[in-house]
Amino acid sequence: MALSKRELFQKRRLRNRNKMRKMANGRARLSVHRSNKNISVQLIDDLNGVTLASASSLEPSLGVVGKNNVEASAKIGEAIAERAKKAGVEECYFDRGGFLFHGRVKALADAAREGGLKF
């Protein structure tokens, strides 16, 4: 029997999470959540269980409220890179969850890399 869309998402999410646990080495995790309306990203220190920085399309200061496109995701990627530098994080690993690395997720990652984050 074929897997549903949700089951495939969970399968990808768990596969990615297990791979990242093996190669974490104390680095922060850049976690992305994408919905139909918004996109948000957090820089998480898993050793201490704290969020070091975050950015979301719901923040009025970024000027992308109500926009759900690749350009908005790129602005959020730039914002998280800037906030990560302020938090003293240069290197992290990218946790896309179960989301495919395409479109808005890819735009966010590329903008974060251009902003100076290494992953």
UniProtKB/Swiss-Prot annotation:
GO molecular function, one term: 5S rRNA binding
GO BP, sorted A to Z: translation
Pfam family, one: Ribosomal_L18p
Keywords: Ribonucleoprotein, Ribosomal protein, RNA-binding, rRNA-binding
Secretion signal, residue range per the UniProt entry: none
Superkingdom per UniProt: Bacteria
InterPro entries registered for this protein in UniProt: Ribosomal_uL18_bac-type (IPR004389), Ribosomal_uL18_bac/euk (IPR005484)
CC per GO annotation: cytosolic large ribosomal subunit
Family named by the database record: Belongs to the universal ribosomal protein uL18 family.
PANTHER family cross-referenced by the UniProt entry: 39S RIBOSOMAL PROTEIN L18, MITOCHONDRIAL, LARGE RIBOSOMAL SUBUNIT PROTEIN UL18M
Subunit structure: Part of the 50S ribosomal subunit; part of the 5S rRNA/L5/L18/L25 subcomplex. Contacts the 5S and 23S rRNAs.
Role description: This is one of the proteins that bind and probably mediate the attachment of the 5S RNA into the large ribosomal subunit, where it forms part of the central protuberance.
Full protein name: Large ribosomal subunit protein uL18
Organism of provenance: Jannaschia sp. (strain CCS1)
Phylogenetic classification of the source organism: Bacteria, Pseudomonadati, Pseudomonadota, Alphaproteobacteria, Rhodobacterales
Gene expressing this chain: rplR
